[in-house]
Swiss-Prot record:
It is an enzyme of class 2 (transferase). ADP binds at residues 14, 18, 268, 311, 412, 416. Pfam families: FGGY_C (PF02782), FGGY_N (PF00370). Belongs to the FGGY kinase family. It comes from Vibrio cholerae serotype O1 (strain ATCC 39315 / El Tor Inaba N16961). NCBIfam families: glycerol_kin (TIGR01311), PRK00047.1 (NF000756). Pathway: Polyol metabolism; glycerol degradation via glycerol kinase pathway; sn-glycerol 3-phosphate from glycerol: step 1/1. Signal peptide: none annotated. One of its GO terms (biological process) is glycerol metabolic process. This is Glycerol kinase. ATP binds at residues 14-16, 268, 311, 315, 412.
Length: 505
């Protein structure tokens, strides 16, 4: 029998599908990545083609192994991590989606959310799912598909349709339709899963008019769900043994498995998660209570705050404003000036996430004077990422009663030393950047590897989490508070835009 030397993480993100191959020492041996189409049918709507998601993801798996000359029988397990909340509904007989995947960023169900609030469901949903009633989560997206796609409601009632977040869709496709599962972390993002009983909530399903028969079976984040065949007939069968939503996978990859440990992922959006262990902490500050992975992939509780526009605001500087030609240039231009010259950018392009939850706020630049140049705007845009992170972290510390000793960071923007230092200064907290910043993939790989005995346990993995650099805060308190007050004022301006609009109508 061939020695199994590798674990593969499939990282299905918002803009690209990736495959990351790790060896036993948790070193990255090979990476393959493919972007796929972003579909914007109308303002505020975002979709993906589920078939393209599967095609790009399966081809990166083959590519990553091929690049490194790794045979499929050398792979011990596959772990999956995915963009969360994004919703796929498909016909189980034909295997075809009835509609495009509705992406987490999509705001089309805002009116459905308003209607559910009017029906008095808000507090029940909050208490039992840990989430706020917002278009972000899967529940209203499924309802929209059933209500708006011709024939979907009838097929659903007849038991022909299945729902899945992206992990569920990939596993179903990879096992030729044999396995319809998700894990606790992804289930907890649907707004349909009761985090007290750890079951699908039949009251919410009934209120949304979604048949229980559509829902996947919910399992731990680290166990063998099924096997996939690589290399066609007579190929190798490899266990799919780990699933976690991208943010929970990153939390696990950062080894935040104990209560009070927290991380921030700077991706398209920013996502802060704090593990609260077996204690369900209810937020009074606009955060979500959600499920994360305990030490062995069993469900644990966490607090989460989502910032919708993190790296996406740097892309906006590049693609729409054309102030930079490469996202990496943002640090260079931001450091050409000493301050943002009184400018604040509030990148509320799709509303504001935690702790504000204002779907109607819009992007705003305030404090413009004649002396402001493009470098100030670039700097203020980077600073907005750090300010939004502080908004969330302040709320987390208030809810949990835990003062954070250090923040672990990951994601594309952590390569930006200016942003990391400014983040430490704004928070007055050390920021730790790990050597391996692919922590989302690491988390999925760890969960899969542990399930099949590729690694013995957490102690072995914790020895692999090395820090590349610690950023220590070095600002005086008066300056910190003054700047942050200015940010809070700027946010009020972004929120006032919609309020004033409503008053005029």
């Amino acid at each position: 029998m061939t020695e199994q030397k590798y674990v593969v993480a499939l990282d299905q993100g918002t803009t690209s599908s990736r495959a990351v191959v790790l060896d036993h020492d948790a070193n990255i041996v090979s990476v393959s990545q493919r972007e796929f189409t972003q579909i914007y049918p109308q303002a505020g709507w975002v979709e993906h083609d589920p078939m393209e998601i599967y095609a790009t993801q399966s081809s990166t798996l083959v590519e990553a192994l091929g690049k490194a000359g790794i045979r499929s029988d050398e792979v011990a397990a596959i772990g999956i991590t995915n963009q969360r909340e994004t919703t796929v509904v498909w016909n189980k007989e034909t295997g075809k989606p009835v509609y495009n995947a509705i992406v987490w960023q999509c705001r089309r169900t805002a009116a459905i959310c308003e209607e559910l609030k009017e029906r008095g469901l808000e507090s029940y949903i909050r208490d039992n799912t840990g989430l706020v009633l917002d278009p972000y989560f899967s529940g209203t997206k499924i309802k929209w598909i059933l209500d708006n796609v011709e024939g979907a409601r009838e097929q659903a009632e007849a038991g022909q349709l299945l729902f899945g977040t992206v992990d569920t869709w990939l596993v179903w496709k990879m096992t030729q339709g044999r396995v319809h599962v998700t894990d606790y972390t992804n289930a907890s993002r649907t707004m349909l899963f009761n985090i007290n009983t750890l079951q699908w909530d039949e009251k919410i399903l009934a209120e949304f008019n979604i048949p229980l028969s559509m829902m996947p079976e919910v399992k731990k984040s680290s166990e063998v769900y099924g096997q996939t065949n690589i290399g066609g007939k007579g190929g190798t069968r490899i266990p799919i043994a780990g699933i976690a939503g991208d943010q929970q996978a990153a939390l696990y990859g950062q080894m935040c498995v104990q209560a009070g440990q927290a991380k921030n992922t700077y991706g398209t959006g920013c996502f802060l998660l704090m593990n609260t262990g077996q204690e369900k902490v209810t937020s009074h500050n606009g955060l979500l209570t959600t499920l994360a992975c305990g030490p062995r992939g069993e469900p644990a509780y966490a607090l989460e705050g989502a910032v919708f526009m993190g790296g996406a605001s740097i892309q906006w500087l590049r693609d729409e404003l054309k102030l930079i030609s490469d996202a990496r240039d943002s640090e260079y231009f931001a450091t050409k000036v000493d301050t943002s010259n009184g400018v604040y950018v509030v990148p509320a392009f799709t509303g504001l996430g935690a702790p504000y939850w204002d779907a109607y706020a819009r992007g705003t630049i305030v404090g413009l004077t004649r002396g402001v140049n493009s470098n100030h705007i670039i700097r203020a845009t980077l600073e907005s990422i750090a300010y939004q992170t502080r908004d969330v972290l302040d709320a987390m510390q208030a809810d949990s009663g835990i003062k954070l000793s250090a923040l672990r960071v990951d994601g594309g923007a952590v390569a930006n030393n200016f942003l990391m230092q400014f983040q430490a200064d704004v928070l007055d907290t050390e920021v730790h950047r790990p050597k391996v910043t692919e922590v989302t993939a690491l988390g999925a790989a760890y969960l899969a590897g542990l399930a099949v005995g590729f690694w013995d346990g957490l102690e072995e993995l914790q020895g692999k989490a090395e820090i590349d650099r610690s950023f220590k805060p070095h600002h005086d308190e008066e300056k910190r508070q003054r700047r942050y007050k200015g940010w809070k004022r700027a946010v009020k301006c972004a929120q006032a835009w919609a309020v004033l609009h409503n008053e005029e109508e």
